[in-house]
Amino acid sequence: MTLMQGRHAAERSPTHRLGFTGLVVLLLAGTAAVASWRFGIFSGASPEPSARDGDPPSAPTDPGEASPEPSPSPSSTPEPINTGIEGLTTFRGNATRTYHGRGPVPEDPEILWRYPTSGGLCGQSSDAAGTRLWCGTGWTGQPNVVEWEGRIQIRFGAYDYAVHVVGGRNGRALMEPFRTGDLIKGTVTSDPDGYPLLYVGSRDNQLRILALDRGRTMEELWSLSADSAPDPTWNDDWDGSPLVIDDYLLEGGENSWFYVVKLNRGYDGQGRVTVNPRIRVMVPGYDDELIAALGDEQVSIESSVAFHDGVAYFANSGGLVQGWDVSDVLLGGDRHRRVFRFWTGDDTDASVVIDEEGYLYVASELERLNGRSREVGQLMKLDPRKPKDPLVWSVPVPGEGGAGGLWATPAVHGRLVIAPTNTGRILAVNRNTGRIRWELRLPPPTWTSPVIVDDVLILGDCAGVLHAYDLSRPGREPPELWSVQLEGCIESTPAVWDGMVYVGARGGAVYGIGDRG
């Protein structure tokens, strides 16, 4: 990505790339060698895995008659993925990235607290433009909201290299910040089943699992380096919000690999939470056909994995959208195969959104200006049941003197798809026909992914204003209900919960916004 420097890690030096077939062969290398390699990439893993969980990941195969158990699926009223706690525990709340939070939405809000109370959450980091100061929270940066031990906890990562846990009512720190080695840009994930665990990626190469039951201190239980993949590419960040399905973690990295990790969660004799992770699936997010079409190796995975009916969907910065059937793996087996492939032509960092009928909504950027981008547009609806011709409709989203397309993840609401664009156009598209019903204009770039709760659309702009619009009559341009001025461009996605809105901005702070009294 080249347009905005606030999102991306420094590019890797060019590396020799194995072909897709060669990668599969590599994964099938001798058992002893693979086992040795796998133990070398973990910290905190047991040296004596179970027979099944200790096996190396197998190459993609046809799952045959494997029948998945019912999976977290969309409905006309999306529900959170959580089974053990109340809250918003991952980016967009569930496996289909369609749960936006819980009302009521505030009616006349103001800033009730700022964290920190003064100064900012800032850190030095380097990218292609050099070393500079980054502040606040970025893309996607949606706070987790978790009801925990009688309190509302707000959990998030920030540009000061740290994970923070603060009180939802007053913004006071509830735990000591956990320091990583670089910026945290993505949305952290709280364990949806109630284990005191937090899953977080950082720009320091590491995907981590943190324990939250050690008093006021978060403790690292496990980490996975982006550089441990056989052929890491492009970047070493982990922007995607990890997805936990039962006892499995699904995640894509900017090293362009997709992982399914068996967590083996539990508790020790002292009642402290434990994990014993094992990689069950590890496949590249690209293939030879994509590299040939692109002519370069910019193929990192920055989207958050979506999941429906046993299939994990994700996209990469080369525009490749994939669906991998991992149903057998989630039942304890090894078989997995790619069942869906679609090329958008350009960088696709927004997460795939899945509606209640199983359709996919995909948003791509417009930077390469190639023939494929012109052919399929930048906002599209796909039918994965028709893998040879999945495009249902598409909407072109041109630039205005610069890059076009979308960085934000669209929101599905009733008959509409709400899609903020890089140029500041907020599009409302009929999700059946693909026709634009209405649009708004906000100061660009609008990277914040919209959230909709109780027919109220909430999103931020790059002038630092958080807006709320009335969507109760979706066929008309919505009137603005209120706005709140924050400090700095709002790239992060808001979280709505019980009368409060929580969001960070590039000015350096995270805010609690609600009605006074």
Language-model segments: residues:
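Alpha-helix initiation/capping motif
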Residues: 16-18, 35, 94, 255, ...
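Extracytoplasmic/lumenal domain signature
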Residues: 64, 68-86, 91, 98-137, ...
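Hydrophobic single-pass membrane-targeting/anchoring helices
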Residues: 12-44
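Intrinsically disordered, low-complexity segments used for protein-protein interactions
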Residues: 2, 37-41, 479
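Terminal targeting segments of Actinobacterial cell-envelope proteins
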Residues: 1-16
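N-terminal low-complexity, Pro/Thr-rich disordered segments
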Residues: 41-80
